């Protein structure tokens, strides 16, 4: 018997966007902690970006993130942690 597909929704009041509205790894870390309540260290986010595990676009020396990409990454992260 197949498992039913679970649709994950962001927390109340958190809007997701495909636009690259978050500038920098520190801002991505802050969004993940403040908006989603994830217990992450900044170095974990930096390592995930460096390994290409966290979706981002690099322009010059700065990484840009979308809230939808961060939310989808957080779902994968929470499966590993929980």
Where are these regions (language model features)?
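Generic N-terminal leader/processing signal
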Residues: 1, 21-23, 57
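Generic structural signal for individual residues within well-ordered alpha-helical segments
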Residues: 29, 46, 71-72
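Intrinsically disordered, low-complexity regions enriched in Ser/Pro/Gly/Gln/His and often acidic
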Residues: 24, 64-66
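Major-groove DNA-recognition helix of helix-turn-helix-type DNA-binding domains
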Residues: 33-64
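Arg/Lys-rich, low-complexity, intrinsically disordered N-terminal tails that contact nucleic acids
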Residues: 2-9, 80
